[in-house]
Every structure is written in structure tokens, then in C-alpha cells.
Amino acid sequence: MSSKGIQKKTKAVDATKKLAEKIKKQALKQKALASASSAASTKESLPVSETISISTSETPVSDVSELSNKEDLSTKKDQSSASSSSSTSSSSSPPSVQSFTEFDLVPELLESIQSLKYTQPTPIQAAAIPHALQGKDIVGIAETGSGKTAAFAIPILQTLYTAAQPYYALVLAPTRELAFQIKETFDALGSSMGLRSVCIIGGMSMMEQARDLMRKPHVIIATPGRLIDHLEHTKGFSLKKLQYLVMDEVDRMIDLDYAKAIDQILKQIPSHQRITYLYTATMSREIEKFKRSLNSPVQVEIVKLEKVPDKLKQTMCLTSPNTKDTRLIQIVNLDSMKRVIIFTRTVVHTRRCCLMLLNLGFKCVELHGQMPQSRRLGAINKFKAGTPILVATDVAARGLDIPAVDLVINYDIPDPTLYIHRVGRTARAGKAGKAISLVTQYDLESYLRIENTLGTKLPKEDLPLDEMQGLQVSVDRALSKAIQMLRNEENDNKLRHRGRSNNK
């Protein structure tokens, strides 16, 4: 090896050592930061009429699989021991609900529940439905897959049966996929009741959706942005007589910058007559603000003990931003026969990584929130059919029917909750799986929070330095080409937009 090559190798090793030292130094600092953050969030909490907290270590069941496969839920869940505490510090156990028949539901709704093989209510359903049937506002803190969709759909359908009217209920969801899943749940549960529902999401025809709205559906499931489009432009459409409002996965809606859109929607819905359900996986200051739109809500919290799959091997790879893409290719090359999901933080990173991989000859597809619905479904179907690599934003981290995955790569480091959702895409159903996280000096705080949550230090992935240096030139070339392709695409879009403006 030449003297220049030795110098390069020495510098890279030194940089890795320095990065490892930084991680050690910031560990104590990060623990203090986590404690301070926890204390601050406690101070921000608003009073509620009652709080019910249920601890469970069960693995949640996907709402979609519950409907599409009609599996017997009793084989998937055992209700854990529960405890509840009210705002006056008294405590009692919530009633043990063994069957949906105990809710005194109308026969038509019970018939649908039984046909779906729903037997014993999940913890969130057992805790929330009785209060919802009494007409109380609900704040539900539970993960996707806990059965929360049925927890708010069943009370709405119960009251709708006795007082049916158009535009009776509105469900706001952060993504198109979740909106479709919620509609499936409502349609299945309301199949014996003549329910009319409509899904109002971006990427679909505004005109067709306007026609659907004019048919006076009972339940509207919508993403916030597209709903505002119809409130502003669809004649005769109004939410002034709305009886129920559901804000599902509010934490994700805030992450997707829908806070202002939700505020705008709330201003158009009479607060004095509506019942509101707010569901979220986490609680934050922003979500506390939305709680103010509820009337003395009952707060139901399912405290799930977050954990990664038992047969998951987790490692981390220390890298610099300049060598991050080369390290990614090294990892993908470890076993080209594996099914891989590469998670990124942004749409730009997803597109750039996918193009780079394609330029290097890999077969892959991308998945992100800016794709039309047809393309998103197409990407998932290609991955299911055998395309080995899926590059995706966190739209693929939860709530989607993604097949068995061998390897998850965290190209960008997420927060601890999203990390658990991401790596949970592998090592499923008792199978082994692996997750590797690429960590730069800019990711230290986020990475340490993950280790804190896991309660363990992740071992380093041993990737040969010589191999990385051998790949660097070809990866840099493929990356430059990908960046240029994105620039050309952006310029073409600008020209098309300018042409449309000139033709008006």
C-alpha cells in the first residue's frame, strides 16, 4: 500500500475512534437531558376528568390484518392486569370485559363484530368503549395495532344507528394508508347497518370525491390537507352538523406539519354539540394544546412495554457523513439475497438513496408520502413480489402490510419509538433478523436516546476499511449521478409549472 493510502486509512481509523469517544462522553449528558425532558412534559399536562392506565406487554395486532384475515383475536391477546387512577388520586381496576355483548350494542353491530371473529375486547377497547358509549370525550394513548380503530368506531356506529344523518362523523388521519384502513374497519363493522362512508385523501380525483360527498355519507375519513381543499372548494359541503370528531394518530399528524390544518378544521366544527376522540401513541406539548378542544375528557392510556423482537440482532456502524453512502453499500453487499428495508428521515434522502442504488445495479423501489397512492401501492406490491430492497421514509415503519424482512438499515437515526417500529419490521413470527444503524457525529444525541430506551449498548458492525475505500469511487460516481437526476427532475417540474401558468 502507498504512503498516501496508509495515511488515508490512519485518518479514517482516528476519526472513528474520536467518534466513539464522543459517544462515551455524551452518555451521562444524555441521561440528564432525558430526565429534564420527562419532568418538563409532566408539568405541561392538562387536567382530565379521569385517567385510566393499563400496562400490557402484549404484541399489538394490526387493525388491517384483523379485518382482511378475519383472525380470531382471542388467540392473539390476553388482557393484562390493569390499574386505574383518577385525577383525585383514587385508584380502582377497570371492569374486566370478556365479551362485546357486555357493551349492550344493537344487534346489527354485534352481528358484524361476531362475523369479524372479534371475541374479547382488547385493553384499549375494554377501557374506552364504556366511557364513549356514555357520551364522554376520550383521549386514548395507544399504539397502532392495539385495536383503537374499533375502540372509536363501535361507539360512533352504535349512536349512528339510532340517529342516522349525513356527515355524522369525521375521522382525521395522517396518511392515506391509515385512512384506507380506518375506512375498511368502519365498512366491515357497519356492513349490517347500511353505513355510507367515504375516504377523502390526496392523490385522488377531487371531482370524484366531491361527488362522493354529495351522496351524503355518514362517516368521512380524511387527511387534513385534502379535507380543507373540499371545505374551501366543494359547494354544499359543510361540517356544521357534525356529531363526532376523531383525531387519530395526532402525534404523526403533528410530525407531518398538519397542526395548522387541524386548527383550521376545528374552527369549522361546532364545539358545543360534538363528541371528540383524540388518539395518539405519545403525548407532547403540541398534543396537549389539542386536548383543550375536548370537553372534560376521560384519558385512557395503554402503557405497552416497548421492546424489540427477541431474535433481532442489533448493531451500529460509526461513520462520517462523507463515507455514509459507501458504508450503506457495504452493508447491502453483505448478503445480496436478503430482503432489505432502508429507512431514511426525508423524502429527498429516500429518492437519492434509491437512485444511487439503481445506478450501482441494485434492484430496489422507493416508498414515501409524496408519491401518488397508486405508486405507493405499486411499490409495496413490487417488494412483496420479490424486489429485494425497499428504500422508505417512516411511512413504512408501521401500519402497512409489509412482508418478511431479513435486514433493516437505519440510514438516518430516528427517535427511540420510531426505532422500535422500524426494527420491528424484521425478526417477526419467531424468525431471526438484523438491524444496522449508521451513526455519524451529528446523530449522537438521537443514538444515545435509543440506547437509553433499549437499556443496552449496541455492538459495532465490523466492516473492513479496505473494502470501503475500494468502493468509494464507484459510490461517489453513482451518488453524483443521482443528485444530478434529482436536479434535472426539479428543473423539469419548474418548467412544466411555468408553462401551465403561462397558459392560464
Swiss-Prot record:
Catalytic activity from the UniProt record: ATP + H2O = ADP + phosphate + H(+)
Checking SUPFAM superfamilies in the record gives: P-loop containing nucleoside triphosphate hydrolases
Disordered as annotated region, ranges: 34-99
- According to the record, the signal peptide region is none
Ranges of residues in domain Helicase C-terminal: 327-471
Q: Where is this motif: Q motif?
A: 98-126
Q: Which GO terms describe its cellular component?
A: cytosol; nucleolus; small-subunit processome
- Motif DEAD box — list its residue ranges: 248-251
User: Which locations, inside or outside the cell, does it occupy?
Assistant: Nucleus
E.C. no? 3.6.4.13
Compositional bias of kind Low complexity:
34-62, 80-99
Q: Write down the InterPro entries for this protein, in alphabetical order.
A: DEAD/DEAH_box_helicase_dom, DEAD_box_RNA_helicase, Helicase_ATP-bd, Helicase_C-like, P-loop_NTPase, RNA_helicase_DEAD_Q_motif
Q: What is its main location?
A: nucleus
Extract the GO molecular function terms from the UniProt entry: ATP binding; ATP hydrolysis activity; RNA binding; RNA helicase activity
Q: Which Gene3D superfamilies does this UniProt record tie to the protein?
A: P-loop containing nucleotide triphosphate hydrolases
Q: Which UniProt keywords apply?
A: ATP-binding, Helicase, Hydrolase, Nucleotide-binding, Nucleus, Ribosome biogenesis, RNA-binding, rRNA processing
Residue ranges of domain Helicase ATP-binding in the record: 129-301
UniProt binding sites for ATP: 142-149
GO biological process terms held by the UniProt record: maturation of SSU-rRNA from tricistronic rRNA transcript (SSU-rRNA, 5.8S rRNA, LSU-rRNA)
Q: Which domain of life is it from?
A: Eukaryota
Domain notes, please?
The Q motif is unique to and characteristic of the DEAD box family of RNA helicases and controls ATP binding and hydrolysis.
Q: What's this protein's function?
A: ATP-dependent rRNA helicase required for pre-ribosomal RNA processing. Involved in the maturation of the 35S-pre-rRNA and to its cleavage to mature 18S rRNA.
* Homology family: Belongs to the DEAD box helicase family. DDX47/RRP3 subfamily.
Known partners and oligomeric status? Interacts with the SSU processome.
What this protein is called in its record is ATP-dependent rRNA helicase RRP3
Protein's organism: Lodderomyces elongisporus (strain ATCC 11503 / CBS 2605 / JCM 1781 / NBRC 1676 / NRRL YB-4239)
Task: Please state the gene responsible for encoding this protein.
Answer: RRP3
